[in-house]
Amino acid sequence: MNNNWLGFSLSPYEQNHHRKDVYSSTTTTVVDVAGEYCYDPTAASDESSAIQTSFPSPFGVVVDAFTRDNNSHSRDWDINGCACNNIHNDEQDGPKLENFLGRTTTIYNTNENVGDGSGSGCYGGGDGGGGSLGLSMIKTWLRNQPVDNVDNQENGNAAKGLSLSMNSSTSCDNNNDSNNNVVAQGKTIDDSVEATPKKTIESFGQRTSIYRGVTRHRWTGRYEAHLWDNSCKREGQTRKGRQVYLGGYDKEEKAARAYDLAALKYWGTTTTTNFPMSEYEKEVEEMKHMTRQEYVASLRRKSSGFSRGASIYRGVTRHHQHGRWQARIGRVAGNKDLYLGTFGTQEEAAEAYDIAAIKFRGLTAVTNFDMNRYNVKAILESPSLPIGSAAKRLKEANRPVPSMMMISNNVSESENSASGWQNAAVQHHQGVDLSLLHQHQERYNGYYYNGGNLSSESARACFKQEDDQHHFLSNTQSLMTNIDHQSSVSDDSVTVCGNVVGYGGYQGFAAPVNCDAYAASEFDYNARNHYYFAQQQQTQQSPGGDFPAAMTNNVGSNMYYHGEGGGEVAPTFTVWNDN
């Protein structure tokens, strides 16, 4: 076993035990500061030399001193334990060496990162006299000697005597290191907690937008515009009034402009707006012709959809499962929402809401579309709420029937001259195959006017609406029928296709425009909305010439008459008004 690990001879002294310390640190730091080593000046014959060497963390092991005595008897190496004291925790005392070896030597190491040693000191005391080793030799050896990293059993056994003080020192260092780590971790946690914003506390009561009247929805992230209508505020009421919702917007600026427009409508040009008043000159002129509710409804329709519904129409929401559009109206059924149904398009749902609004709120209701679009009178008089299929039936029932201009009798009873209406013939088509008419399965509407006393032998007319009239108009020509005046027929009668269909005393006879006249075997005068097909075709001869009575007759907006002068054609007159 090599005991010359100090690098110089110890032969003058008898050595019974040798201690060797093993350090696992890769670097060695020597504090070379005057005054770091101390010895007892009161000792007469013994000199104790205190040499302080420091090693970096985590060991923090300090080899206190190597003492020797000038006496002849042998002495063991005294390895003084150390107690570590953090510079930040001066009040806490580390374990003392006298607790273990009964000595009074105490060494304080101020920091695990060894500094200049200005805040640390070594105090050594000995029982006997002796000389001190030269510090220069030890410093030179420590600088030149690498750290022994061999951790074998022999070194482990040799360092047993040092283990007590080393363990105490190491445990002290480890405890201080752990305490420092805990403190550092605590500071880090505190810093992270302080850096993390507390949403529930800091965001409470704070504005979510820099614009007036704009808030950011915390769930959807979209911006909503609203204003407070204080016109309905009661006396003594502490609230700001009624909140008017202006819609949801994707951009914060759009929501701010919606608020500005609504504020200008409610409070005039003297109100405070988010943007200059000069940017709203056109809108101010437009809003003069609208009420507050109508203008708010228009703002909602211009929005990018409500935050709680994906429709731009009032009272319309989209179902979250099947995606169909639902219509609801509020505050009509015991201050609750009334479900109006589910529709395929949002326009149909908006119409259902409008009908319900007109029914429950009258002419002052705010609707999605113009109120002239609906038959307001029929909706108000309807005993039930015409929504959906009922609304469609109501539209069909209230569809305006084409107006007719009646041919009236302007001839007085005393006048039997030929100046009055004698007879009339209608424009017809020649060379048209009648079988083509039966290929179109169209509906036949029978319009009639029972103005007076109709002859039972007169022909009855049925009219068919023909959508493909332009196919027949290509080969048409006008034919004036020359029907002689008969004495048995009064001058105020009207003849259609050679048949007398009316006599004196009736108010008139109407023929719808763009309809085809057919002779039918039977005709129900009370079947106004029934549909017919031609059942029988008849041909008759008239005194003026041969032409089919049941002909393809495209009655235009003109009718012609043949007067007594023979062959003279009077100016045309309107029989049917398309408007």
Curated annotation (Swiss-Prot):
Keywords: Developmental protein, DNA-binding, Nucleus, Repeat, Transcription, Transcription regulation. It holds the Pfam family AP2. GO terms for molecular function: DNA binding; DNA-binding transcription factor activity. Residues 149-177 are annotated as: Disordered. Residues 210-276, 312-370 bind DNA. InterPro entries: AP2/ERF_dom, AP2/ERF_dom_sf, DNA-bd_dom_sf. Transmembrane segments: none annotated. Mostly expressed in developing seeds. GO terms for cellular component: nucleus. It is found in: Nucleus. The keyword Repeat applies. Residues 165-177 have a biased composition (Low complexity). Transcription factor that promotes cell proliferation, differentiation and morphogenesis, especially during embryogenesis. This is AP2-like ethylene-responsive transcription factor BBM1. The lineage of its organism: Eukaryota, Viridiplantae, Streptophyta, Embryophyta, Tracheophyta.
